[in-house]
C-alpha cells in the first residue's frame, strides 16, 4: 500500500500490474481514472471520482491512469493484496511496474501516450476551471509548465 499526492493540472503515467488494486480518494475536488484493456483503447472507460470515491483495477491486463482535474491537490491511498498486487500472470513482479513498455515493463511513458489521453484531460480541466500543468512532459499541451520532475506528478 502507498499514498500518492499530485498537484492540480497533472496526472500519473498509464500503467498496469496484477489485479486487485483499490484506490481510495482521500482529498481533492475532482478528477478521474481511465481504464482500458485493448491496445486501441476501444474499451476505455472514464471513471470520475471525488472525495471518498474508490477505483478498483479489475484485471491483470488492465491499463489505468489517474488524473487530477479538480481545483485542489489530490491524494489517494492505493491498497493492494499481500503480494503488492504487482505479480502478473504475464510474468515478472514489481520490478516491471515502473519500467517503460519499451523496456519490457508495464508503464506507458508520457511521450508514448496517445494524444487523445491528453485531450480528454484538457477538456475535463476546462470544465473544472483549472489549468493544465503538463507542458514539461507533453509537447502538445496547451497549458503551462508546472512540475519538471516526474516524481512531482
Where are these regions (language model features)?
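Double-stranded beta-helix
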Residues: 67-152
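A short beta-strand-loop-beta hairpin characteristic of the jelly-roll/cupin
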Residues: 16, 22-51, 62
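Short, glycine-/Ser/Thr-/acidic-enriched flexible segments
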Residues: 8, 29-30, 62, 81-84
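Extracellular structured ligand-interaction cores
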Residues: 1, 19-20, 30, 63, ...
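Conserved metal-binding segment of the jelly-roll/cupin
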Residues: 47-70, 79-82
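Intrinsic, low-complexity N-terminal interaction/targeting segments
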Residues: 1-2, 34-35, 56
Amino acid at each position: 500500500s502507498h499514498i500518492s499526492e499530485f498537484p492540480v493540472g497533472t496526472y500519473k503515467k498509464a500503467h498496469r500490474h496484477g489485479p486487485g488494486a483499490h484506490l481510495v480518494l482521500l482529498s481533492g475536488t475532482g478528477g478521474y481514472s481511465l481504464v482500458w484493456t485493448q491496445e486501441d483503447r476501444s474499451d476505455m472507460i472514464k471513471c470520475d471520482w471525488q472525495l471518498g470515491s474508490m477505483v478498483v483495477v479489475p484485471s491483470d491486463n488492465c491499463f489505468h491512469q489517474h488524473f487530477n482535474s479538480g481545483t485542489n491537490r489530490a491524494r489517494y491511498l492505493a491498497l493492494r493484496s499481500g503480494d503488492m498486487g504487482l505479480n502478473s500472470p504475464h510474468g515478472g513482479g514489481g520490478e516491471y511496474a515502473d519500467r517503460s513498455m519499451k523496456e519490457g515493463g508495464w508503464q506507458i511513458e508520457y511521450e508514448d501516450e496517445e494524444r487523445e489521453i491528453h485531450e480528454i484531460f484538457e477538456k475535463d480541466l476546462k470544465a473544472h476551471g483549472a489549468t493544465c500543468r503538463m507542458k514539461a512532459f507533453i509537447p502538445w499541451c496547451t497549458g503551462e509548465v508546472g512540475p519538471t520532475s516526474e516524481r512531482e506528478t
